[in-house]
Amino acid sequence: MENRYHGAWTVPLSHCDDTARLSVQGALSQFMDIAALHAEQIGVGGEAMAQRGLFWLTVRSRIRLYARPAMMQTVTLETWPGAVENLRCERFYTMKHGQTLLAEARTQWAVLDLAGKRPVPVAPVYPPELILPEETVCDGAYAPLRGVPEDEVCRYTVRSVDLDLGCHMNNVAYVWMLLGTFPSAELHRIREMETHYRRPCFEGEMLSIRRRRTEDGWQLAAVKESGETAVAALLRTAADAAAGAAENP
């Protein structure tokens, strides 16, 4: 059983920004796509999980970008499952051009029992013959992301196009929503984005999008009308000169 997915990918127009280079949300979207593909290959894809009454939930994600490939440039993608700790597990991702690392990411997942609406231990979900690689990337403890910024930027209504097969807002749709509150020049400076998914959101729900400046970027949150935080995020940004350099892999 292949415990890693490895493949070439040509950056499409749909994943690029106004500079004709891969966007933050485009990179994360593609990483999620290859995670789903590899899950199918090792027997824990969406349909197989549904037959067992189970569903994958994204708990946290982090992506770091070092250089953004241009539209129609071919890069190499890799993903593999990582450590399992009771109710949580990790998955790792890399994007390279030759030997040059362009981006890396990690996601933390949980498995939901659909009948009981509760998380279950992850280890029994994986096939017993699957050997989990020890290699990790995008290292470092997840940020605590305590507190909620006070300044409201806008309000956002969850739309039908934001939903995934779980009938709630897709994890990458949250990223699109949060990044859409910034001008394009600020998006070009993003070097890291960490996102914590705390409460599911459903079609028609209204979210208050809030943010505040930090020493090296932004803290963001989307808050439900009930006062619950649906998603929290941290952006780390670079200076203008570094941002320009990072667009030339």
Descriptions of predicted regions:
Residues 18-21, 67, 73, 165-166, ...:
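Short histidine-centered beta-strand/loop micro-motifs
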Residues 182-212, 219:
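A conserved acidic, glycine/proline-rich C-terminal tail/linker
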Residues 53-68, 189-200:
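Small beta-barrel nucleic-acid-binding modules, principally OB-folds
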Residues 1-58, 104-106, 113-191, 248-249:
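Hot-dog-fold acyl-thioester-processing enzymes
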Residues 2-6, 62-145, 201-204, 212-249:
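HotDog/MaoC-like acyl-thioester-processing domains
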